[in-house]
Amino acid sequence: MKTQVTKARLEAKVNIDIYELLKQAAAITGRTLTDFVVSVAYEEAKKTISEHQVLRLAVNDQALLIESLSKPFEPNPSMKNALDVYEAYLSITGKNNDK
């Protein structure tokens, strides 16, 4: 019977100054060094992924906008009707839109 792996191990060699700084920050927050490092890394990873997804969506949206703007415009029937109504209004009121 296979058992499911629910945890993974992460090791890192760091400069002693970084280690002492992390240890001090962990102590200030009342957490273990491991808990502190993992929680900060986890939050930073979520933030990085979120920013990347927003950027990727923005690039995709730009491509869609450029594609839409490069196509010739063809008004739909409702827009054509609205233009006809507007032009009729202008002819009835004597107002000229060329000013």
Swiss-Prot record:
SUPFAM superfamilies, sorted: Ribbon-helix-helix
GO biological process, one term: regulation of DNA-templated transcription
Family membership: Belongs to the TacA antitoxin family.
Protein name per its UniProtKB record: Orphan antixoxin protein TacA
Keywords of the record: Toxin-antitoxin system
Gene label: tacA
Organism: Haemophilus influenzae (strain ATCC 51907 / DSM 11121 / KW20 / Rd)
Functional note: Putative antitoxin component of a toxin-antitoxin (TA) system; its cognate toxin (usually a tRNA acetylase) is unknown.
